[in-house]
């Protein structure tokens, strides 16, 4: 088995384990364990972000870092006060997009649109196949969940989560490009405990660090926090 196939298998296993852990945590003690877990991820991601400055430090990059840090803080605030229903919207709309975009990109990338890339200047690895399929499937999941709920409320705003997930992912890719960082796992904390956690969340073998794991969630939930303050 080649390294790509092995990494793909690891990604599947890690994804399933994290999903099971998240669901169990969501339905234990009113979801407090899940919110604590996300808060921990956000803190470590923030530390990773701060260490970007060892690569390239400019005023523009500092501003970008402050924006990303603000997103991490805002998203933690949003998730900490979110209900189980909202958490499910987030799971379907954000990690849902990330997962299906990744797998469809790996399996079908380049087979339909060949060498054409949707965002070549920001993320060369993203494919049209992965982006489109990821958006369609995650949007379908969020829409079905919304229709099954059958409530005509402000929950319709969560239908935009897949698009926000894509934008958040692109922003983090742009951030790494500006800092000349190929992957977030280049700048992880040099500590055995955190190194093991990096492996657990898929932060080795080119999968990125903690920031890669929650970049889409941070952006999407921050925007949701702003929208809910305006709409609700």
Predicted regions span which residues?
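Disordered, low-complexity tails and leader-like regions
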Residues: 1, 30-33, 42, 59
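The first (N-terminal) embedded transmembrane alpha-helix
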Residues: 8-25, 38
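Short, hydrophobic transmembrane alpha-helix segments
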Residues: 21-35, 52
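Hydrophobic alpha-helical membrane segments of integral membrane proteins
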Residues: 34-39, 89
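Central hydrophobic cores of alpha-helical transmembrane segments in multi-pass inner-membrane proteins
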Residues: 39-49
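Juxtamembrane boundary at the C-terminal end of a transmembrane helix
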Residues: 226-232
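Interhelical loop and helix-boundary elements at the membrane-water interface
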Residues: 1-16, 47-220
């Amino acid at each position: 088995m080649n390294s790509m196939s092995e990494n793909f298998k690891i990604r599947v296993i890690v994804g399933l384990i994290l999903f099971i852990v998240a669901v169990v945590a969501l339905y234990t003690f009113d979801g407090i364990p899940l919110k604590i877990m996300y808060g921990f991820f956000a803190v470590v991601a923030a530390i990773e972000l701060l260490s970007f400055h060892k690569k390239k430090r400019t005023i523009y990059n500092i501003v970008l870092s402050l924006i990303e840090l603000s997103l991490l803080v805002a998203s933690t605030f949003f998730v900490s006060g979110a209900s189980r229903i909202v958490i499910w919207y987030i799971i379907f709309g954000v990690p849902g997009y990330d997962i299906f975009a990744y797998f469809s990109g790996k399996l079908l990338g380049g087979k339909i649109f060949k060498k054409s890339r949707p965002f070549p200047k920001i993320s060369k690895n993203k494919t049209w196949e992965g982006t489109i399929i990821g958006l369609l499937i995650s949007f379908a999941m969020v829409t079905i969940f919304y229709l099954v709920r059958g409530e005509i409320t402000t929950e319709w705003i969560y239908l935009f989560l897949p698009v926000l997930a894509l934008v958040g992912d692109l922003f983090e890719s742009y951030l790494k490009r500006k800092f000349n960082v190929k992957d977030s796992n280049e700048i992880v904390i040099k500590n055995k405990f955190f190194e093991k956690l990096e492996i657990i969340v898929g932060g080795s073998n080119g999968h990125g660090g903690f920031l890669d794991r929650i970049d889409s969630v941070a952006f999407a939930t921050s925007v949701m926090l702003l929208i809910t303050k305006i709409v609700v």
